[in-house]
Protein backbone atom coordinates (compact mmCIF):
# COMPACT_ATOMS: atom_id res chain seq x y z
CA UNK A 1 0.00 0.00 0.00
CA UNK A 2 1.35 3.41 -0.98
CA UNK A 3 1.44 6.05 1.79
CA UNK A 4 -1.20 8.03 -0.09
CA UNK A 5 -3.42 4.98 -0.62
CA UNK A 6 -3.11 5.36 -4.40
CA UNK A 7 -2.85 2.47 -6.83
CA UNK A 8 0.61 1.88 -8.28
CA UNK A 9 -0.43 3.39 -11.62
CA UNK A 10 -2.35 6.37 -10.20
CA UNK A 11 -1.33 9.99 -10.54
CA UNK A 12 -1.85 12.37 -7.67
CA UNK A 13 -4.68 14.90 -7.93
CA UNK A 14 -3.66 17.17 -10.83
CA UNK A 15 -4.77 20.75 -11.40
CA UNK A 16 -3.65 23.40 -13.87
CA UNK A 17 -5.01 26.84 -12.99
CA UNK A 18 -4.45 29.28 -15.87
CA UNK A 19 -4.11 33.08 -15.66
CA UNK A 20 -2.98 32.75 -12.06
CA UNK A 21 -1.03 36.02 -12.05
CA UNK A 22 -1.85 39.31 -13.71
CA UNK A 23 1.20 40.54 -15.62
CA UNK A 24 2.84 37.58 -17.38
CA UNK A 25 1.77 36.63 -20.90
CA UNK A 26 1.14 33.14 -19.54
CA UNK A 27 0.80 31.95 -15.95
CA UNK A 28 -0.27 28.65 -14.44
CA UNK A 29 -0.42 27.23 -10.95
CA UNK A 30 0.37 23.55 -11.43
CA UNK A 31 -0.45 21.16 -8.60
CA UNK A 32 0.61 17.52 -8.43
CA UNK A 33 -1.04 16.64 -5.13
CA UNK A 34 0.65 18.78 -2.47
CA UNK A 35 3.43 19.88 -4.84
CA UNK A 36 2.52 23.31 -6.15
CA UNK A 37 4.57 25.20 -8.76
CA UNK A 38 3.83 28.64 -10.18
CA UNK A 39 4.85 28.74 -13.84
CA UNK A 40 4.97 32.05 -15.72
CA UNK A 41 5.89 32.69 -19.34
CA UNK A 42 7.25 36.07 -20.43
CA UNK A 43 7.71 37.25 -24.02
CA UNK A 44 10.94 39.20 -24.53
CA UNK A 45 11.73 41.11 -27.73
CA UNK A 46 15.32 39.88 -27.80
CA UNK A 47 17.31 36.69 -28.20
CA UNK A 48 20.60 35.45 -26.73
CA UNK A 49 23.81 36.26 -28.63
CA UNK A 50 23.99 32.89 -30.38
CA UNK A 51 20.57 33.53 -31.99
CA UNK A 52 21.02 37.16 -33.06
CA UNK A 53 20.43 37.63 -36.78
CA UNK A 54 19.36 34.00 -37.21
CA UNK A 55 15.66 34.71 -37.57
CA UNK A 56 15.05 32.17 -34.82
CA UNK A 57 13.83 32.62 -31.29
CA UNK A 58 14.73 30.92 -28.02
CA UNK A 59 12.93 29.26 -25.13
CA UNK A 60 14.64 29.17 -21.76
CA UNK A 61 13.71 28.60 -18.13
CA UNK A 62 14.58 29.43 -14.55
CA UNK A 63 13.62 27.35 -11.52
CA UNK A 64 13.60 28.15 -7.84
CA UNK A 65 12.05 27.21 -4.53
CA UNK A 66 10.56 29.49 -1.91
CA UNK A 67 12.43 29.31 1.40
CA UNK A 68 9.62 27.43 3.13
CA UNK A 69 8.54 25.25 0.23
CA UNK A 70 10.03 22.32 2.17
CA UNK A 71 9.70 20.96 5.71
CA UNK A 72 12.51 23.17 6.99
CA UNK A 73 13.43 26.63 5.75
CA UNK A 74 16.24 26.97 3.23
CA UNK A 75 17.97 30.24 2.38
CA UNK A 76 17.16 31.90 -0.91
CA UNK A 77 19.84 31.17 -3.48
CA UNK A 78 20.12 34.91 -4.15
CA UNK A 79 21.14 35.37 -0.52
CA UNK A 80 23.82 32.70 -0.91
CA UNK A 81 25.11 34.34 -4.05
CA UNK A 82 24.87 31.36 -6.38
CA UNK A 83 22.55 28.65 -7.63
CA UNK A 84 22.99 25.06 -6.57
CA UNK A 85 23.89 22.41 -9.10
CA UNK A 86 20.41 20.91 -8.65
CA UNK A 87 18.75 24.20 -9.57
CA UNK A 88 20.90 24.59 -12.69
CA UNK A 89 20.20 21.01 -13.74
CA UNK A 90 16.44 21.40 -13.35
CA UNK A 91 16.12 24.71 -15.18
CA UNK A 92 18.17 23.36 -18.09
CA UNK A 93 15.90 20.33 -18.18
CA UNK A 94 12.80 22.54 -18.33
CA UNK A 95 14.32 24.59 -21.16
CA UNK A 96 15.25 21.48 -23.16
CA UNK A 97 11.78 20.04 -22.65
CA UNK A 98 10.10 23.19 -23.96
CA UNK A 99 12.43 23.58 -26.94
CA UNK A 100 11.72 19.99 -27.98
CA UNK A 101 8.20 21.01 -29.05
CA UNK A 102 8.92 24.50 -30.40
CA UNK A 103 9.71 25.54 -33.97
CA UNK A 104 12.23 28.26 -33.13
CA UNK A 105 12.07 29.69 -36.66
CA UNK A 106 8.30 30.21 -36.32
CA UNK A 107 8.89 31.97 -33.00
CA UNK A 108 10.91 34.68 -34.74
CA UNK A 109 13.55 36.63 -32.84
CA UNK A 110 11.71 36.52 -29.53
CA UNK A 111 12.61 34.79 -26.30
CA UNK A 112 10.02 32.93 -24.29
CA UNK A 113 11.32 33.00 -20.72
CA UNK A 114 9.71 30.55 -18.31
CA UNK A 115 9.97 31.02 -14.55
CA UNK A 116 9.04 28.04 -12.40
CA UNK A 117 8.79 28.79 -8.68
CA UNK A 118 8.04 26.00 -6.23
CA UNK A 119 5.56 27.23 -3.64
CA UNK A 120 5.27 23.88 -1.88
CA UNK A 121 7.32 20.73 -2.44
CA UNK A 122 6.14 17.17 -1.93
CA UNK A 123 8.15 15.36 -4.58
CA UNK A 124 8.12 15.77 -8.35
CA UNK A 125 8.75 19.50 -8.51
CA UNK A 126 10.61 19.31 -11.83
CA UNK A 127 7.90 17.21 -13.46
CA UNK A 128 5.17 19.57 -12.26
CA UNK A 129 7.26 22.51 -13.49
CA UNK A 130 7.54 21.05 -17.00
CA UNK A 131 3.87 20.10 -17.19
CA UNK A 132 2.73 23.52 -15.99
CA UNK A 133 5.30 25.48 -17.98
CA UNK A 134 3.96 24.07 -21.23
CA UNK A 135 0.48 25.42 -20.48
CA UNK A 136 1.94 28.81 -19.55
CA UNK A 137 3.98 28.80 -22.77
CA UNK A 138 0.88 27.94 -24.78
CA UNK A 139 -0.96 30.94 -23.32
CA UNK A 140 2.02 33.21 -24.01
CA UNK A 141 2.06 32.09 -27.64
CA UNK A 142 -1.67 32.81 -27.86
CA UNK A 143 -0.93 36.34 -26.66
CA UNK A 144 1.77 36.72 -29.33
CA UNK A 145 -0.65 35.57 -32.01
CA UNK A 146 -3.34 37.93 -30.77
CA UNK A 147 -0.93 40.87 -30.78
CA UNK A 148 0.38 40.07 -34.27
CA UNK A 149 3.95 39.36 -33.14
CA UNK A 150 3.99 36.03 -34.96
CA UNK A 151 1.98 34.67 -37.88
CA UNK A 152 1.56 31.07 -36.76
CA UNK A 153 2.00 29.07 -33.58
CA UNK A 154 5.53 27.70 -33.11
CA UNK A 155 4.23 24.92 -30.84
CA UNK A 156 4.42 21.55 -32.59
CA UNK A 157 3.27 19.23 -29.82
CA UNK A 158 2.53 18.98 -26.12
CA UNK A 159 5.22 18.07 -23.59
CA UNK A 160 4.77 16.82 -20.03
CA UNK A 161 6.75 14.94 -17.40
CA UNK A 162 6.22 12.51 -14.56
CA UNK A 163 8.27 10.58 -12.03
CA UNK A 164 8.27 6.81 -11.71
CA UNK A 165 10.17 4.55 -9.36
CA UNK A 166 10.60 1.15 -7.80
CA UNK A 167 9.28 0.97 -4.25
CA UNK A 168 9.65 -2.39 -2.50
CA UNK A 169 10.08 -4.03 -5.89
CA UNK A 170 6.91 -2.50 -7.34
CA UNK A 171 6.93 0.12 -10.13
CA UNK A 172 4.89 3.16 -9.06
CA UNK A 173 3.83 6.37 -10.79
CA UNK A 174 4.18 9.99 -9.65
CA UNK A 175 6.10 9.63 -6.39
CA UNK A 176 5.42 11.96 -3.49
CA UNK A 177 8.16 12.91 -1.03
CA UNK A 178 7.57 9.95 1.29
CA UNK A 179 8.05 7.52 -1.60
CA UNK A 180 10.80 9.48 -3.31
CA UNK A 181 12.94 9.49 -0.17
CA UNK A 182 12.59 5.72 0.32
CA UNK A 183 12.46 4.31 -3.21
CA UNK A 184 14.86 1.76 -4.69
CA UNK A 185 14.94 3.54 -8.05
CA UNK A 186 13.93 7.09 -8.97
CA UNK A 187 13.26 8.10 -12.57
CA UNK A 188 11.95 11.25 -14.27
CA UNK A 189 10.55 10.92 -17.76
CA UNK A 190 9.74 13.74 -20.20
CA UNK A 191 7.66 12.94 -23.27
CA UNK A 192 5.75 14.67 -26.03
CA UNK A 193 2.04 14.33 -26.63
CA UNK A 194 2.74 12.13 -29.66
CA UNK A 195 4.75 9.69 -27.54
CA UNK A 196 8.32 10.77 -28.25
CA UNK A 197 10.86 10.66 -25.45
CA UNK A 198 12.61 13.93 -24.61
CA UNK A 199 14.53 12.88 -21.53
CA UNK A 200 14.83 9.90 -19.19
CA UNK A 201 16.68 10.43 -15.91
CA UNK A 202 16.94 7.24 -13.86
CA UNK A 203 19.03 6.39 -10.82
CA UNK A 204 19.26 3.32 -8.62
CA UNK A 205 19.25 4.52 -5.02
CA UNK A 206 20.32 1.12 -3.72
CA UNK A 207 20.33 -2.13 -5.66
CA UNK A 208 20.59 -1.84 -9.46
CA UNK A 209 17.36 -2.11 -11.43
CA UNK A 210 16.81 -4.67 -14.16
CA UNK A 211 15.87 -4.20 -17.80
CA UNK A 212 12.43 -5.55 -16.91
CA UNK A 213 12.13 -2.89 -14.19
CA UNK A 214 13.19 -0.21 -16.68
CA UNK A 215 10.60 -1.37 -19.20
CA UNK A 216 7.87 -1.47 -16.54
CA UNK A 217 8.70 2.05 -15.33
CA UNK A 218 8.82 3.38 -18.88
CA UNK A 219 5.41 1.91 -19.70
CA UNK A 220 4.01 3.41 -16.51
CA UNK A 221 5.47 6.82 -17.40
CA UNK A 222 4.03 6.66 -20.93
CA UNK A 223 0.54 6.02 -19.58
CA UNK A 224 0.90 8.73 -16.93
CA UNK A 225 2.15 11.34 -19.39
CA UNK A 226 -0.71 10.56 -21.79
CA UNK A 227 -3.09 11.43 -18.95
CA UNK A 228 -1.13 14.59 -18.10
CA UNK A 229 -1.34 15.72 -21.73
CA UNK A 230 -5.10 15.21 -21.53
CA UNK A 231 -5.17 17.41 -18.42
CA UNK A 232 -3.22 20.05 -20.37
CA UNK A 233 -5.65 19.85 -23.28
CA UNK A 234 -8.63 20.17 -20.95
CA UNK A 235 -7.09 23.15 -19.16
CA UNK A 236 -6.45 24.87 -22.50
CA UNK A 237 -9.93 24.10 -23.83
CA UNK A 238 -8.55 21.83 -26.55
CA UNK A 239 -10.10 18.55 -25.42
Swiss-Prot record:
Its EC number is 2.7.7.56. The keyword Transferase applies. Keywords: Nucleotidyltransferase, RNA-binding, rRNA processing, Transferase, tRNA processing, tRNA-binding. Phosphate binds at residues 86, 124-126. It catalyses: tRNA(n+1) + phosphate = tRNA(n) + a ribonucleoside 5'-diphosphate. InterPro entries: ExoRNase_PH_dom1, ExoRNase_PH_dom2, ExoRNase_PH_dom2_sf, PNPase/RNase_PH_dom_sf, Ribosomal_Su5_D2-typ_SF, RNase_PH, RNase_PH_bac-type, RNase_PH_CS. GO terms for biological process: rRNA catabolic process; rRNA processing; tRNA processing. One of its GO terms (molecular function) is 3'-5'-RNA exonuclease activity. It comes from the Bacteria. Homohexameric ring arranged as a trimer of dimers. Phosphorolytic 3'-5' exoribonuclease that plays an important role in tRNA 3'-end maturation. Removes nucleotide residues following the 3'-CCA terminus of tRNAs; can also add nucleotides to the ends of RNA molecules by using nucleoside diphosphates as substrates, but this may not be physiologically important. Probably plays a role in initiation of 16S rRNA degradation (leading to ribosome degradation) during starvation. Belongs to the RNase PH family. This is Ribonuclease PH. It comes from Cupriavidus taiwanensis (strain DSM 17343 / BCRC 17206 / CCUG 44338 / CIP 107171 / LMG 19424 / R1) (Ralstonia taiwanensis (strain LMG 19424)).
